[in-house]
Design a protein with these regions (language model features):
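Short helix-capping/linker turns of helical repeat alpha-solenoids
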Residues: 1, 10-12, 17, 30-33, ...
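Terminal, low-structured helical/coil segments at or just beyond the last alpha-helical repeat
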Residues: 246-271
């Protein structure tokens, strides 16, 4: 039933038909198939083939999670953590993250690390946070390497921070490219190299990093790693700043500092 639903969803061997996909997912879910429950929950969360309904999404994520699906344990943890579709409940978030982590779910381990690092739902404990990050990173979670790099940088362990940023960037973590760009721009641990800094920011921007977009606009305004373009650079800086104000990245490490740096750069170059 799950396979039939997936074929109709993807249009594999049949004409794509969301109604048929949902029908087969529902039948599979009613028969206890965890993957059908997962896909049905995703459809309700995203409004794919059905009207968006977070109550139904939570219902099926919970059913799949209770059945042992680690991905859905993590999904529930994230939804309760961020208050998406449900009232924020950090006790439930931590519970689901921990259950997923017990099954070696790397993203759940990283999220637990973030909770301990920020004191969100648990007492702040950086040592415990770093242990969760380490375990997640060992399983290939690039964001965990970035998070480790950030805390090592704040502790002044710059060579170790660079190594984790590099590993995270190799795993396509967009914020890691921002961090590497800063190291190259300022000559931290590595030789100062404006062109390499700019390349890092360009790579991160393509991956969706607003922090990289802000840095890249600043590079173009100041001529870092390339020709200076004052008027066009100022326009890009203003555009990047407006985008940054609305971005979901606002809670990221260093985000507010980047916005303030861009504001100062604009003010210093407007005359």
């Amino acid at each position: 039933m799950y396979n039939l639903g997936r074929c109709y969803k993807m249009g594999h061997g049949v004409e794509q038909n969301w109604q048929e996909a949902i029908k087969w997912y529902e039948q599979g879910a009613q028969c206890g198939n965890l993957q059908s429950m997962h896909n049905l929950a995703c459809c309700y969360e995203r409004g794919e083939g059905v009207k968006q309904n977070m109550t139904e999404a939570i219902r099926w994520y919970t059913a799949a999670a209770e059945g042992g699906n680690a991905d859905d344990m993590y999904n529930l943890g994230w939804l309760y953590d961020h208050g998406e579709g449900v009232e924020q409940d950090m006790k439930k978030a931590i519970c689901w993250y921990e259950r997923a982590a017990e099954q070696n779910h790397p993203a759940a381990m990283n999220s637990l690390g973030e909770c301990y690092a920020m004191g969100r739902g648990v007492p702040r404990d950086l040592e415990t946070a770093m242990e969760w990050y380490r375990r997640a990173a060992e399983l290939g979670e690039a964001m965990a390497d970035y998070n480790m790099g950030w805390h090592l940088e704040q502790a002044g362990k710059l060579s170790e921070a660079y190594a984790h940023y590099r590993k995270a960037a190799d795993g396509n973590d967009d914020s890691a490219w921002w961090a590497l760009g800063r190291f190259y721009e300022n000559g931290v641990v590595v030789a100062q190299d404006g062109k390499e800094a700019r390349r890092c920011y360009e790579t991160g921007e393509k991956l969706g990093s607003v922090k990289c977009k802000m840095r890249l606009a600043r590079c173009k305004l100041l001529g870092i790693g390339g020709r200076r373009a004052k008027k066009a650079g100022l326009d890009l800086c203003r555009q990047a700043l407006e985008l940054a104000k609305e971005s979901s990245e606002k809670e990221d490490y260093g985000y507010e500092a980047e916005m303030n740096l861009l504001r100062r750069t604009i003010a210093e170059n407007e005359s």
